[in-house]
Amino acid sequence: MKPSIAIILCILILGVDSQRWVQFMKEAGQGSRDMWRAYSDMKKANWKNSDKYFHARGNYDAARRGPGGAWAAKVISDAREAVQKFTGHGAEDSRADQFANEWGRSGKDPNHFRPAGLPKRY
């Protein structure tokens, strides 16, 4: 099925008005950028035990964009964890990452996971 036909079906069947669909896609794009920014900051910071903070922060920022941002954060987070599981990385660490992801997406303060001494710019 062509993407354009799928979009039209969604609009007709689900009753999604076109402006809301455009807004959802805009939020998803912005949420994706929020997730990328958190990942980039995590790599730049290179701070021990900070990954859970950046997971929570990326999801938090993306979800604040709206339903599209929350959707993008979930898709990106789940894909990342699926890749880790496939490559054989620790299941326990993956569960902890998912907990931090859900914490951020639910609107809870990502600073709960902030490690001591992490520079304020992050």
From Swiss-Prot:
Q: Does the keyword Secreted apply?
A: yes
Keyword Metal-binding in annotation: no
Tissue range of expression? Found in various tissues.
**What is one process in the GO biological process aspect for this record?**
response to stilbenoid
Region listing for Disordered, in residue ranges = 87-122
Which controlled-vocabulary keywords does the entry list?
Answer: Acute phase, HDL, Secreted, Signal
Signal peptide coordinates: 1-18
Q: Which family does it belong to?
A: Belongs to the SAA family.
Q: What is the designated name of this protein? A: Serum amyloid A-3 protein
